[in-house]
Regions:
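Extracellular protease catalytic domains of secreted zymogens
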Residues: 1-233
């Protein structure tokens, strides 16, 4: 079983905005993990898990502040939509017909991410000292750890391992995942120096979350360990 960070896929130059996904996160045999953060009271409730959001009067300022993490997502140009995901992707295409871009990405491609987890403010040890890091490089290991603990518990109970996680996720979405209804992923992660100003680049188009069971921002939502253990007995 493999988990992989969906990564930061927006280009750091607004003139080169394009839809793209990375391998191996886009492989149908990999569980792709996106990222969330706690809402700051903008379009969401404070503390509610969201993908990147804007809030406050100064949108440029908030884009810089809250593009510290961004959940990459989209559709593969190399892999077709796998059978286990087909219904979820088709539902997204129909329910978001008036919101999403009509072109620029492969509508019949493998969609990522599959699910998401918190990607903000992980405590780490870097270069002989403590550090705080953020990104899907934190959320992917979090999911891997949850599944490893679940498999260990199942082993103690004399049960088989969970196996290929994607089948479980898409077949039991509402039973084991929590919906993420706010956020988008059209901005780059972090910030960069543009014309002497530290700013985040946001493309005119991107994907948003919340209007279907699965979306190319947070996937099916965030995994509940307790719900997973109940459904997987």
């Amino acid at each position: 079983m493999y988990w992989y960070s969906a990564g930061y896929l927006a280009r750091n130059d607004s003139r080169k905005c394009q839809y793209t996904v990375a391998f191996p996160a886009s492989c149908p045999w990999v569980t792709s993990v996106g990222g969330t953060m706690n809402g700051q009271g903008g379009t969401s409730q404070r503390g509610e898990p969201v993908a990147l959001e804007e809030w406050g009067a100064n949108s440029e300022e908030t884009k810089t502040m809250f593009a510290k993490i961004t959940s990459a997502g989209g559709f593969s140009n190399h892999f077709h939509t796998p059978a286990y995901q087909k219904y979820a992707v088709e539902e997204y295409m129909i329910s978001n017909a008036g919101k999403r871009a009509k072109s620029g990405y492969n509508r019949s491609g493998r969609g990522i991410p599959d699910l998401s987890a918190n990607a903000l403010n992980f405590q780490a040890w870097i270069d002989a000292g403590p550090a705080t890091i953020s990104g899907t490089s934190g959320s992917a290991p979090s999911i891997a750890g949850m599944i490893s603990v679940a498999n260990a518990q199942r082993g103690k109970n004399g049960q088989k391992r969970l196996g290929f996680l994607n089948l479980l996720l898409y077949n039991h979405t509402t039973a084991i995942l929590n919906s993420i209804v706010h956020g988008y992923n059209n901005c780059t992660a972090g910030s960069q120096l543009i014309n002497g100003t530290d700013s985040t680049v946001c493309c005119e188009e991107g994907f948003s979350s919340g209007s279907s069971e699965w979306d190319p921002v947070v996937g099916l939502g965030s995994l509940s360990y307790l719900k997973l253990m109940n459904i997987a007995q």
